[in-house]
Structures are given as structure tokens and as C-alpha cells.
From Swiss-Prot:
Residues in the Cytoplasmic compartment per record: 23-36, 83-102, 144-155, 206-219
Species classification: Eukaryota, Fungi, Dikarya, Ascomycota, Saccharomycotina
Pfam families for the chain: ER_lumen_recept (PF00810)
Endoplasmic reticulum in keyword set: yes
Gene Ontology MF terms in the entry: ER retention sequence binding
Source species of the chain: Kluyveromyces lactis (strain ATCC 8585 / CBS 2359 / DSM 70799 / NBRC 1267 / NRRL Y-1140 / WM37) (Yeast)
Transmembrane segments: 4-22, 37-54, 63-82, 103-116, 124-143, 156-174, 185-205
Ranges per topology, Lumenal: 1-3, 55-62, 117-123, 175-184
Location of the protein in the cell: Endoplasmic reticulum membrane
Protein name as catalogued: ER lumen protein-retaining receptor
Length: 219
């Protein structure tokens, strides 16, 4: 049975990637974008899809895995190119991108080792990717608090990325009733991720949707 929530979530994720790439290429700048968050997302998708060529579910799943891995790597390449194309903006981004990601990666490794469905390398990496994805946006939000504002395209990107995971909550409910499947790890980490975005969603609605301007944090 067609799961519209899953598809809507995936396309929201694709939209966030397109918005981010457009923001970098049209402005020729990485102003307000966290390289550390992009590195974390790349790590998320690489560790989650280690079974890319060994476990076949559907053509849709296979293509989405390819898109998410390749696009996350492509974004990092685009951002690194700005070091030479726009060195001033790139250095400014590096200066502001100060979140210590080791404090995210190490606990997520430990959680992956403790909470998994089978103590195997692929399963531990899969669990690690869920925990890491739930907090991967934190360097971006931390940068936002340091600058106090974000361009419209950047805020649209963060919103679409948060919406993707929020849509997975009704997806899990749908799967529970249609497939009698309940993935506790995915649900728990997904709820954490949605809560991480909650303040941003409210400010985005108030500042960007209602007023149509750039996103600015309240003083």
C-alpha cells in the first residue's frame, strides 16, 4: 500500500538538498551554512546505507539511497570549493562553525553499540546513524544562534530538512497499522530530532512565513 507520508518525507528531504545546492551555487557563498552539519549528514548516510548493494528492497529505496549519499558528498565538495572561489566568506563560515562535533559523534557511537537489534557491524552503524541524524543539525542551529539571523534560502533549507523527519512520525504510525511493524529506535530518534527543530519551526513560521523576511532570532 502506498505510504504517502514516507514519500512526502523523502521529497521534503530532496527539496532541502536542492535548496541548499541552489543557495551555494547562486550566491557563490557558504555564508550561514555549517560545514560540520554537512559532514555529519554525509557520515549519517554512508553508515546507514552500508547494505546498499547487499540488501534489495525496491528500486525506489535503492535510488533514494544513491541520491542521499551522492548529494551529501556533492554539497561538501561545493562548500570546499568556496575556499578558493570565495575565501573571505569561506573563512568567515569556518570561524563561526565552532560546534565541537566530537561531543555528538562519540555518544552516538556508544548509543549505537548499546541500542541495536543485532550486534553486527552493519546494525551498529545503522543504529549509530539514527542517533547521529537526530542531532546532526545542532552545529547549523548553533551557528544560527551565533549570527542571530539566516538568509531565506538557508532557513528554507533547515525547515525542509526538519519537515522531512517530522513527516516520518506519521509514516511510522501508518506502518504500524498497515504492516504491524514498529521500529522503536527509529521512532525514538525521530521524535528527538523533531524536538530539536521545534523552536526553529516556531521562529520560521513567525519571521519567514508570516512576515516574508529573513529569519532573525529574537533578541
Amino acid at each position: 500500500m502506498l505510504n504517502v507520508f514516507r514519500i512526502a518525507g523523502d521529497f521534503s528531504h530532496l527539496a532541502s538538498i536542492i535548496i541548499l545546492i541552489q543557495s551555494i551555487t547562486t550566491s557563490n557563498s557558504v555564508d550561514g551554512i555549517s560545514l560540520k552539519t554537512q559532514l555529519l549528514y554525509t557520515l549519517v548516510f554512508i553508515t546507514r546505507y552500508l547494505n546498499l548493494f547487499t540488501k534489495w528492497t525496491s528500486l525506489y529505496n535503492f535510488l533514494m539511497k544513491i541520491v542521499f549519499i551522492s548529494s551529501s558528498v556533492y554539497v561538501i565538495v561545493l562548500m570546499r570549493q568556496q575556499k578558493f572561489k570565495n575565501p573571505v566568506a569561506y573563512q568567515d563560515m569556518i570561524t563561526r562553525d565552532q560546534f565541537k562535533i566530537k561531543f555528538l559523534i562519540v555518544p552516538c557511537i556508544l548509543l549505537g553499540l548499546i541500542f541495536n537489534y543485532r550486534f553486527s557491524f552493519i546494525q551498529i552503524c545503522w543504529s549509530f546513524s539514527l542517533w547521529l541524524e537526530s542531532v546532526a543539525i545542532l552545529p547549523q542551529l548553533f551557528m544560527l544562534t551565533k549570527t542571530g539571523k539566516a538568509k531565506q534560502l538557508t532557513s528554507h533549507y533547515i525547515f525542509a530538512l526538519g519537515l522531512y523527519r517530522a513527516l516520518y512520525i506519521p509514516n511510522w504510525i501508518w506502518r504500524y497499522y498497515t504492516e504491524e511493524r514498529f521500529d522503536k529506535l527509529s521512532v525514538f530518534t525521530g521524535v528527538i530530532q523533531t524536538l530539536v527543530y521545534s523552536d526553529f519551526f516556531y521562529i520560521y513560521y513567525q519571521k519567514v512565513i508570516k512576515l516574508g523576511g529573513d529569519l532573525e532570532l529574537p533578541q
